[in-house]
């Protein structure tokens, strides 16, 4: 089996984490790190408490703690919304091999707007950045949008992409 076999289950879990974040009064973002079909770590958004505590940041830190290394080569990061620039740089620093997100973020996405996840030039700064990860966007977008629509975060989703 490969990572693609687990994409739907892991993305569904991210959407559940996003809903849990909304239920506790925070922004609707959930993320997790997996490798070889095994859940390594999860993260719920906690930016209401600390502005840099995005779901991806927490999932990456938790994966680092669990695995005992900051080299997460071979891991996939799943997230309910496209990672922002800060999270995208962290994904590159942790050397994540694959990123799967549900909702595009046309105003602040680290992939669709700022191209950080695809930027091959960052590789020249080894050992700080890993190679560009494989990126799959729009996975279970409709389901993630249902959670997003419970909040004022209307600007996320493919319908808001600039033409």
Where are these regions (language model features)?
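Zinc-dependent deaminase
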Residues: 1-21, 90-163
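Helix-adjacent hinge/juxtasegments
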Residues: 61-98
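Glycine-rich phosphate-binding loop at the start of an alpha helix
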Residues: 8, 15, 53, 57, ...
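Short, flexible loop/turn motifs enriched in small residues
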Residues: 24-28
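Short beta->alpha transition motifs characteristic of CBS
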Residues: 40-47
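Short beta-strand scaffold segments in enzyme catalytic cores
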Residues: 29-37
């Amino acid at each position: 089996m490969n990572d693609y076999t687990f994409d739907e289950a892991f993305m569904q879990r991210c959407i559940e984490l996003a809903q849990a974040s909304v239920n506790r009064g925070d922004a609707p973002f959930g993320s997790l790190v997996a490798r070889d079909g095994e859940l390594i770590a999860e993260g719920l958004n906690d930016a209401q408490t600390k502005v840099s505590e995005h779901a991806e940041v927490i999932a990456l830190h938790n994966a680092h703690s669990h695995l005992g290394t900051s080299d997460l080569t071979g891991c996939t990061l799943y997230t309910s919304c496209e990672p922002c620039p800060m999270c995208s740089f962290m994904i590159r620093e942790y050397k994540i091999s694959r990123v799967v997100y549900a909702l595009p973020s046309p105003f602040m996405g680290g992939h669709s707007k700022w191209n950080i996840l695809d930027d091959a030039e960052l590789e020249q700064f080894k050992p700080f950045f890993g190679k560009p990860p494989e990126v799959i966007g729009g996975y279970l977008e409709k389901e993630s949008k249902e959670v997003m629509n419970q909040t004022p975060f209307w600007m996320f989703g493919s319908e808001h992409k600039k033409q």
